[in-house]
Amino acid sequence: MTLHVGAEPAPREDDTEDALREPELDLSVQYGDEITSDVRKTLPKRKLIAEWIEPALFASAQLTVRFVGEEEGRTLNAGYRHKDYPTNVLTFAYDAAPDGTVIGDLVLCCPVVEKEAHEQGKPLTAHYAHLLVHGALHAQGYDHETSDEDAAEMEALEVDILAKLGFPNPYQ
């Protein structure tokens, strides 16, 4: 789910010299109060998170990834989406910087991600990779809830990016 805070979709094509440069990622990683040191040991590290997100970027981005527990996940989902339960990933997309840099926060609720991975028979690593790619696409304006065509486009991008990263199709 994407929460747009005055955000416009990131430009996908540009005919200037900047379009020839690879998108750059300025990444911060945070941990909510509920994330114990034992849980942190099981989470992907910053370098791996960046390796998963970078192929999903079509513009430079300044992103914060925050890992949270059920309480914070529920509070955020209730406060911003009016749904009183934690969800796997929330994306907060903000207005792009003047240079077009995408700015956003990706919040992943660890207990929900772990439960889904177990229920779906997926490796936890693969599920985190999928949700980070999914969230990065949301931060750039992609949306799967506006139309079937948009959902198909976003899913196809996710499947392609994850395949390049060595992960199977998350929708099968």
Swiss-Prot record:
The annotation note on the cofactor reads: Binds 1 zinc ion.
Q: Which family does it belong to?
A: Belongs to the endoribonuclease YbeY family.
Gene3D superfamilies in the cross-refs: Metalloproteases ('zincins'), catalytic domain (3.40.390.30)
Q: Which compartment or compartments is the protein found in?
A: Cytoplasm
Enzyme Commission code = 3.1.-.-
Give GO terms: molecular function aspect only: metalloendopeptidase activity; RNA endonuclease activity; zinc ion binding
Entry keyword set: Cytoplasm, Endonuclease, Hydrolase, Metal-binding, Nuclease, Ribosome biogenesis, rRNA processing, Zinc
> What name has this protein been given in UniProt?
Endoribonuclease YbeY
Give TM segment ranges: none
Record GO cellular component, one term: cytoplasm
What functional role does this protein have? Single strand-specific metallo-endoribonuclease involved in late-stage 70S ribosome quality control and in maturation of the 3' terminus of the 16S rRNA.
Its needed co-factors are:
Zn(2+)
Query: Binding residues for Zn(2+), per the UniProt record?
Result: 134, 138, 144
Region spans: Disordered: 1-21
Q: Which organism is it from?
A: Burkholderia lata (strain ATCC 17760 / DSM 23089 / LMG 22485 / NCIMB 9086 / R18194 / 383)
Q: Where is the composition biased (Basic and acidic residues)?
A: 10-21
| Biological processes, Gene Ontology terms | rRNA processing
